[in-house]
Amino acid sequence: MMHGMTGTSAKMQPLAKQLVPEGWTILCPEAKIPHPTRGGFAWWLRSDNPIEPLNKYSLKQVDESISRVLEELPDGPLIIGGFSQGAAIASAMLETEIQERIIGLVLLGTKTIKPDKLREILPFLKSRIVVWMHGEKDHLVPLEQGIEHIEIFEDAGWPVKRLEHSKGHMVNLNQLEELKSEIQKMADSI
């Protein structure tokens, strides 16, 4: 489970512990790019409008972050997820050599980094469960961008559970049991 911008592994651990399926272990990688003004770490930095696509420099940081996470992953099946930037990294991991080991995705308050690439690859990959959560009042990742992301999976025929809520850029704890249930289904699918 990967944290968002300005997050840390330690900040992600409590949520991950609540969501982990029985018999599974938790890994919360930590991004390596220090946030210059707000503390914590980022998987990539950008100075332009967050609604716009990433520039080449930010995309390079994404690729470097993914490479670092890949080095930390254990052997065996994986449920990959995260919040905000961390979930975007999780989704992008479908473009890597470990994609066959991913049995489910947990995408919380996020958008896709490379929508065209995701559209291109998903039809050729074995579908797996995706649980998606996004807030209607999200001021950092607008709901429309979150919907664009999850619709790419739906359009490719992947099984998706949508958990939309009326709050902002956050995990809605009122939907925690539904989220846990979907993650348990992922674990039970192997």
Write out the residue ranges for each language-model feature.
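Alpha/beta-hydrolase fold nucleophile elbow
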Residues: 74-82
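Short beta-strand/loop motif that positions the catalytic acidic residue
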Residues: 131-134, 138
